[in-house]
Amino acid sequence: MSRHPVGLLDTSTLLLLPRLGAAADLPERPLISAVTLAELTVGPLVAEDLTERAARLAEVLQAEADFAPLPFDAQAARAFGLVAADLRGSGRKARARTFDAMIAAIAIANDLPLYTCNAADFAGIAGLRVVAIPHPDASPA
């Protein structure tokens, strides 16, 4: 697989980075979105176990230290409308996948490929270039 110089990581891929063995599958310069940072920020607030809360807070702090998130701006908002329409047209509810739809919109608005371990979540979205990353828990084919 050829590497893109820059690419947007979805939230699950960011969280799995320490477990992803093949760095060649990732962009040379990975980026995250403000939506991913927002999604991560929920984690420590809803964790009931103190150890889990601390681990999730560490993930947020690490993401903040490692990345300058791309914003959900007006261009992304316009792209979001198209993403939501595509999801609805394929029988999926954009509301149920709002974070994913917003991340996809940011990728489209910035003309970036989206790197994900959950490629099926982004299938059928026009204008979105998805780079599927093998999930570390998937059994080999």
Model-identified regions with their sequence ranges:
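Alpha-helix capping/helix-boundary segments
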Residues: 13-14, 76, 120-121
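Acidic, PIN/NYN-like endoribonuclease modules and their adjacent C-terminal/linker elements
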Residues: 1-2, 104, 110-141
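Active-site neighborhoods of divalent-metal-dependent phosphate/nucleic-acid chemistry enzymes
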Residues: 2, 42, 67-113
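Residues that scaffold the ATP/ADP-binding catalytic core of kinase and kinase-like folds
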Residues: 16-18, 43, 80-83, 125, ...
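Helix N-cap/beta->alpha junction signal
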Residues: 33-34, 73, 100, 118
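Acidic active-site catalytic centers that drive phospho-/nucleotidyl reactions
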Residues: 10, 39, 100, 118-121
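Structural motif
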Residues: 28, 65-68, 126
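Short, well-structured N-terminal submotif of metal-dependent ribonuclease cores
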Residues: 1-61, 137-140
